[in-house]
């Protein structure tokens, strides 16, 4: 059960690593609740793809997408990855298929490209960015399709799939990694907030 008592005098700092899409979807509520309980704790947020974060040793807590077949970390959430495009547009009908995806070293991008390769569907990486908001802006303009967590799909977009000639996508396992060399009461308390926040 998450600690709910407010401790305004607790001080310290925590370094968190997380991909950009998880920041947009989950972290605002988590950090807001944590700041209310521990207003003096400094949180240092590093946004990078999961692949890059897994190589780092200097973070206290890391939220990443787990590769299929691995058992690292504490499971926070499993969520479907879906294809999406803007309402009123049909970029999925274009040949080659225009994609808007994160830059390289993104597991979701690799899964999408591998799935399209497996069904021999021609595609092009029309737009790439490290920013989720940039990717979604391109998709909202009807310029490309994307593959993202289902919970990230906004009301101005629609989920597409096999009916539109697209391959099924796997579910993403989102996990929390703790750095055993830098644990503290502050770090563990924020970890509790993260675990609870991903359930909401």
Question: Each PLM stretch: what is its role?
Answer:
Residues 71-104:
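Flexible hinge/capping segments at coil-to-helix
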Residues 42-47, 122-131:
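Short beta-strand-to-loop elements that line the ligand-binding cleft
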């Amino acid at each position: 059960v998450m600690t709910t008592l407010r401790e305004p005098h607790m001080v310290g700092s925590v370094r968190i690593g997380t991909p950009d899409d998880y920041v947009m979807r989950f972290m605002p509520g988590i950090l807001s609740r944590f700041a209310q309980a521990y207003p003096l704790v400094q949180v240092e947020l590093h946004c990078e793809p999961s692949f890059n974060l897994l190589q780092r040793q200097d973070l206290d807590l890391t939220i990443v997408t787990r590769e299929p077949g691995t058992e690292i970390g504490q499971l926070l959430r499993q969520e479907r990855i879906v294809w999406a495009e803007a309402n009123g547009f049909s970029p999925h009908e274009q040949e080659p298929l225009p994609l808007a995806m994160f830059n390289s070293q993104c597991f979701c991008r690799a899964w999408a490209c591998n799935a399209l390769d497996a069904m021999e569907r021609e595609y092009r990486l029309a737009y790439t960015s490290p920013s989720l908001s940039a990717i979604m802006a391109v998709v909202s303009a009807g310029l490309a399709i994307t593959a993202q967590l289902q919970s990230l799909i906004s009301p101005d977009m629609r989920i597409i799939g096999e009916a539109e000639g697209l391959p099924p996508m796997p579910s993403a396992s989102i996990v929390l990694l703790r750095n055993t060399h830098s644990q503290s009461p502050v770090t563990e308390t924020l970890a509790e907030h993260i675990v609870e926040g991903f359930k909401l």
